[in-house]
């Protein structure tokens, strides 16, 4: 577990040291630009949906179908996807495709990490490598969303809500770190099947309730 956390930490160190070098031959610089490329689609889609309105997406039937449907897609990707590529093998096009997949996470129930891992597996990434890139890609995406919400609360003068939001971010960060440990430990020898089963069960339950069964 510690090794997994240190691996991600080392990758981030490399990014911070060499991000300003526009050179895909440098590992740290390449990873930085891959993350940037993978983040841009979600930022654009998020701003577009925000201006259009997202309330209609919060329907329990939509959530149920996305949880169930993307659980099946993850199962297919994990079964059919090759397991030979690592983060260092990713190209700008790969990062863009993963970033486009991440846009689907704007639909409630999709799971940001789940959909990015799914695309990574379709692109032939090793399970642990797909999970690592999904986690690295989450940093700017979640940070941008948090800053946007914080700015909106600040401009409305709702400082109490800002405190609540900060508490939520803190707890979310703690549980995210815990999730990293658990996922990396599990993926050493296992597949995504338990996560697929969880999504199938939860999605089915929500749909049955939504349709009155």
Where are these regions (language model features)?
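Juxtamembrane boundary at the C-terminal end of a transmembrane helix
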Residues: 207-213
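Interfacial loop-to-transmembrane junctions
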Residues: 176-201
